[in-house]
Amino acid sequence: MRESTGISEQGEQTIQDFIQALTIQEDLNPKTLKEYASDLKHFIGWFETADHHEDDIFRIEDVATPTITRYRDAMQKSMKLKPSTINRRLITLKRYFDWAVSESKIRRDPSKPVKLVPEEKVSPRQMTDKEEAALVAAAEHGGSLRDQTILIVMLHTGLRTMEVCDLAPGDIQIGKRSGQLTVRSGKRNKQREVPLNATCRAALERYMYVLPPDSPYLFPSEKTGDRLTERALRHLIQKYMKAARLEGLSAHDLRHRFGYVMAENTPLHRLAQIMGHDSLDTTMIYVRATRADLQSEVEKIAWQ
């Protein structure tokens, strides 16, 4: 029997079982769970209609590797979806079938041999020197010492918002001519050490001098004293972006700013280590030449 949502009751139950398992086993936010459910529903809807199954009911044991390959091809050719959307849905399927194997619902994962589609990586927009100065000035003019220090730390270490929120005072080590901070909550919980330059050390020393000694977090919420949430951090950065009249930038662009500036003089493998990248491919986005760079290079050999 088909639900009003467009897929069978069996399909709906499949989604519910998977999402319930993720809810129990992993700490995922509601938005991520909703995306997983939507992606799986898209596949099941295609399976029960476009793939021409006689009884129109989804059964996981009926899904083979060629089935998923046909789905990938359909998303590319007839649906004309963007590579990023196709890959996100394929990754969801891979996660679903991996879970199904772990729960003994199937013996083999049919999605394993299926490759993702090529995706052209676009380098993030670069924040300029002028924009960085305007952002810092906006915080100095109307922000607290905590907010000013947060911006300096993010611009000079490239930390992710989650990593900034999780910092504790004990994660900071400052000497006379060097310093470092320890990131304990990076992606996949990988710990790493990030060096602190003179600007960062001076800002942190000034800020930590007035920070309550019993504070469990380096940058606690000014309202509650508890952990500053990532949402609150993004909001405060956006506030200063707006005050500085900067458009098209977000909190993550502070990390990109660090990556671009460092890439000019830092070997790729060292930059990847500092930024906590698992793959050098991720770090490569900071060394790809812009159109202006390429134009400048070819102009050098022009006949005058």
At which residue positions do the language-model features occur?
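Conserved catalytic core of the tyrosine transesterase superfamily
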Residues: M1-Q304
